């Protein structure tokens, strides 16, 4: 990260407590990562067929015409894993390509691109919850790449000023002054959650906890709950007494519906003081997606 003079925005300590949960693919970035399937032809033979994540969300239940190679979903999603043979994660390679296409004006950014950018600049705590199978550290490196390549020098300075403001407000000015910009940024990134819900790491987290751990929707529900519990642990530690809101955005209607129902039936009852808002970003023509207020009254300010 380029050198930026350290400043502190002391006003951030009075902000509302707004937090965000983002799906990655086709929500933050259109990743050039493909799912390896087989497609049935008219003569009942099967041929290899590469599918984008956007198309897969539409055809994934069409088992009559699409199937994984040799019936093995691991082979279908090989590009969505961190492999020991890779010098650099396929996720990071594809993230760089996807960012290039947006920054060069080749394609429009997905619906949550600018919201994610704003979240980083404001120094808000967030979670990445994706159906990918990468390590959490890989997702974090993707966020670091986004910060480095997307944020302008002025936005990076504003982000650091906001982060220093939070540190000064909650941990004290001595702690703020003792830390370098690199340490401030690293501490912030460590506060966030990076859940790739088909990764071996995440499977260990849900094993014995979820009755149906193989369902992507169930894993995303668990990841959302884990993040909200994480937030409340932080809020209790710092003793903040302000309105709390959590926004969730995803481009897959099945995930949107599953999380919306989970919030209504479980999280809204457990956390009645929180305003939960879900954004369905499956329609790329809607700039920030279709907004669904699930519970609470506080405006997230994303309209």
Provide a role label for each language-model segment.
Residues 1-2, 302:
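Non-Sec secretion/translocation targeting segments of pathogen effectors
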Residues 12, 16, 120-127, 133-303:
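C-terminal cap/substrate-recognition subdomain and adjoining C-terminal extension
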Residues 2-198:
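Alpha-helical substrate-recognition element adjacent to the catalytic core
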